[in-house]
UniProtKB/Swiss-Prot annotation:
It comes from Rickettsia prowazekii (strain Madrid E). Signal peptide: none annotated. SUPFAM superfamilies: S-adenosyl-L-methionine-dependent methyltransferases. This is Uncharacterized protein RP028. It comes from the Bacteria. InterPro entries: CFA/CMAS, Methyltranfer_dom, SAM-dependent_MTases_sf. The lineage of its organism: Bacteria, Pseudomonadati, Pseudomonadota, Alphaproteobacteria, Rickettsiales.
Amino acid sequence: MIKKTNKISYDEVPYPPFTFSHTYPPYLRTIGKLFGLNPPPLETAKILDIGCGVGVNLLNFAETYPKSQSLGVDLSKTQIEIGKKTISDAKIKNVRLKALSILDLDESYGKFDYIVCHGVYSWVSKEVQDKILEVLNKLLNPNGIAFISYNTLPGWNMQNTIREMMMFHSESFNTSHDKLQQSKLLLKFINDSLENSTTPYANFLREEAKLISTYADSYVLHEYLGEINTGTYFHQFIEKAQKKPFKLLR
């Protein structure tokens, strides 16, 4: 049995700042239109980004639509402070970032036309997962669109195999740096050991080990060595979401 107790703080190791085109409100609005909805106009849209990190995913939209208003929330005070400095330096006036637990999100923050929750759902407890769906139910405006991503089963089982190997190999080490270095050694061992093997399983392990070796250290720490990373079957997520009055855009 693997002891999954790696608590790697996002304050200690900030997540790398990425932008994700599939969470961009114009893209989400287009999807809604294709499904026969009448999503709110982008020019004056109110955006909520749950687990925003340093908030870079909000900046392009805010610059393009200066009359819009965006709020990004994240538990990591370090990431929020980094993001606030970026926003201040760029002189962007219509984005707010706040260090806040998802559990503390409520109606006092207002309602939103587009809510994005990318890279959060699989990495939090069941309590927080339920709260995310509650937030969408209470804070999403009529005809608004929400985006949630998560690691989907059964496909995630393949990556989780390597994740568990990395966690087992590194669990006796105390610091994030040591865990990461040991995991890199494991990946090299996997790659070297399977160099001449041509079985489908060996091919997968070898190629996945090579791929993980190219990722940023901070990404590997949170994705493969973090305390929680739980895959979800699509039907399980749909069953939970259907308990709320959502129309699912599949």
